[in-house]
UniProtKB/Swiss-Prot annotation:
Protein function: Interacts with the SecY protein in vivo. May bind preferentially to an uncomplexed state of SecY, thus functioning either as a chelating agent for excess SecY in the cell or as a regulatory factor that negatively controls the translocase function.
HAMAP family: Syd
This protein's name: Protein Syd
Cited NCBIfam families: PRK04968.1 (NF003439)
Keywords, alphabetical: Cell inner membrane, Cell membrane, Membrane
Membrane topology: Peripheral membrane protein
Superkingdom classification of source: Bacteria
Localization in the cell: Cell inner membrane
InterPro entries per record: Syd, Syd_sf
Native source species: Edwardsiella ictaluri (strain 93-146)
């Protein structure tokens, strides 16, 4: 049975790609990802890569849990392993964000290292564990997944200040509005 997060992520991605194609007449594009190998690459032109989502290859995120001896919330793995894609700009109510996605196998390894670093910082500051999902325009805030409850939060980096955006990642993805703008 397909995980609900996988289905919700695929549905959001379809809406994102459709909006991009309607507004720009082409696949989503990125200057920041130009020249970086990925199964997503459709073609490159003028220092820009055009991409489409591609299915993940069965990777997991268990390295994060093993590194810190914690059990990851079950919603996290499908969010990052369902597909390869470029980061996607979106809006949730008034908050604009860049949804973090995995571009390649190498990018997945980098993501895991960054998540471990995030969790180590939280442990050092005695904060409950979260895992980042998206960056925001405000460099001090990010959208995260609470590893204990599975809620999606707007979190101030290094602070206990957190606001619940959605009770589940599936609910969050269903309410997220795609913005056909280049990320990065």
């Amino acid at each position: 049975m397909e995980h609900q997060v996988s289905a919700a992520l695929r549905e959001f991605t379809q809406r994102y790609v459709a909006q991009w194609q309607q507004q720009h007449g082409d696949w989503p594009s990125s200057h920041a990802l130009y020249g970086i190998p990925s199964p997503c690459v459709v073609y490159s032109r003028d220092d820009c890569v055009f991409w489409r989502p591609e299915p993940g290859r069965g990777e997991d995120l268990e390295g994060i849990g093993r590194a810190l001896d914690i059990r990851l919330h079950p919603a996290l793995a499908p969010f990052f392993t369902t597909q390869y894609a470029g980061d996607m700009r979106a809006r949730w109510n008034e908050i604009e964000m860049d949804l973090v996605q995995v571009w390649s196998v190498e990018d997945l390894h980098r993501l895991q290292e960054n998540q471990i670093g995030h969790l180590v910082t939280q442990r050092r500051l005695k904060l409950s564990p979260t895992l980042f999902l998206a960056s925001t325009a405000d460099e001090l805030s990010m959208v995260t997944l609470c590893n204990l409850s599975g809620s999606v939060l707007l979190e101030q980096f290094g602070s206990p200040q957190r606001r619940v955006l959605a009770q589940t990642l599936t609910e969050f993805l269903a309410e997220l509005q795609p913005l056909a703008q280049e990320v990065g």
